[in-house]
């Protein structure tokens, strides 16, 4: 998570912080923690995060971790439903030490992705789902299973262990396509964005249609993506971080609920797969790559 990251959402975050006067190395110090620090488990990660007594934590993490660190440090979280997860009392007045942005990562969002993929490829019956094992074993996996069942789609999970590498993703995609499935869906993990070029190439080798989370994978040659506006969410994260650094209590900052979703499609990739997007998809696409 750096300002010159290949991840466009992190660039937006730091650009907005800079615009508000928080410049890393000058007026802002940033400690970074991720999959690499999870080797010894959640307690050791918690200890590492809070030992330097940060003024605020930006967390894209499990609810248990967010709750634990919030007992000590104000948190801006990018999460699912914070009320259902027990993070806050209400969206309008969180009331505790946590605020942030809520995104629907439940059955409705996954169901919409399945629906759109089926509109593009009506023959879809068996869906290969590629994501981190940790996500599959948690709320995301439950939501995906629920969505697939409601859509009458057989789900074939192909799971990648954390920390995931580019090779892990490519192997999971290619090997799962060999054993069955006639369409692919990539999960919401940021690591899929980091390895987007290799992932798109691996999917292309399978000659199967695929639904992605991030539009950047469609720009890299993927077929289609449907998700919330992550650039907007990271701008809002920077706004919340700025407010907390200037003295506002997180419990007084409303928890934002994302309502904007974007559909991206790649006509060149569709043509290569022999797919013609129906008017129902063409008419609602926010981004069309030709």
List the predicted regions and their residue ranges:
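Short hydrophobic alpha-helices and adjacent helix-cap/hinge residues
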Residues: 1-290
